[in-house]
């Protein structure tokens, strides 16, 4: 019986570091998004290195890194990650990959604008934000390639991906 108790306790302690790491990763991405938002809103001075570093933080923590942070057996309590991630693994993985591609394009925008936010980085007036999960638009048309989008639009799509992922895969907690 003592051997059984030791065996059942092991997975719990093995999961805790994964949960802590992914929570730290999500916080780092949220902080990076606040930096980018502050730059676009004019609350922070434009600094191409800070802009790029923030976009790179999101890029490095999305894609495969994000997928690896949600292994089977680490979902549910004590984290807010829903077990539904496992049932919808393909969708979750695709969303993590989409986020990575958007963040990579956003990062490269800083290389093209070393001195300040350019008009090309800004969303055009009336530019539609109607993208849905994974860039699929109503009627089946896909969004433009991320490398062709203004940086501000990329950033809004990143935030939309975060919102979509949290709405589906994150348990609301008080």
Regions found by a protein language model. Give the residues of each.
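N-terminal signal peptide c-region/cleavage motif recognized by signal peptidases
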Residues: 6-9
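Short, surface-exposed loop/turn segments at secondary-structure junctions
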Residues: 42-51
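Sequence context surrounding c-type heme c attachment/ligation sites in exported
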Residues: 12-43, 56, 61-174
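Bacterial N-terminal signal peptides
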Residues: 1-4
């Amino acid at each position: 019986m003592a051997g059984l108790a030791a065996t059942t306790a092991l997975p719990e302690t093995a999961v805790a570091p994964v949960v802590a790491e992914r929570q730290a990763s999500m916080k780092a991405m949220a902080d990076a998004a606040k930096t980018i938002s502050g730059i676009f809103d004019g609350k922070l001075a434009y600094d191409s290195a800070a802009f790029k570093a923030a976009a790179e933080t999101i890029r490095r923590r999305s894609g495969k890194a994000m997928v690896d942070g949600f292994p089977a057996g680490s979902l549910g309590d004590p984290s807010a990650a829903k077990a539904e991630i496992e049932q919808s693994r393909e969708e979750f993985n695709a969303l993590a990959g989409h986020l990575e591609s958007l963040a990579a394009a956003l990062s490269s925008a800083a290389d093209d604008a070393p001195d300040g936010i350019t008009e090309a980085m800004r969303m055009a007036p009336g530019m539609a934000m109607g993208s849905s999960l994974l860039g699929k638009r109503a009627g089946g048309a896909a969004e433009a390639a991320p490398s062709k989008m203004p940086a501000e639009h990329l950033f809004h799509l990143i935030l939309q991906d975060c919102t979509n992922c949290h709405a589906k895969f994150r348990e609301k907690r008080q």
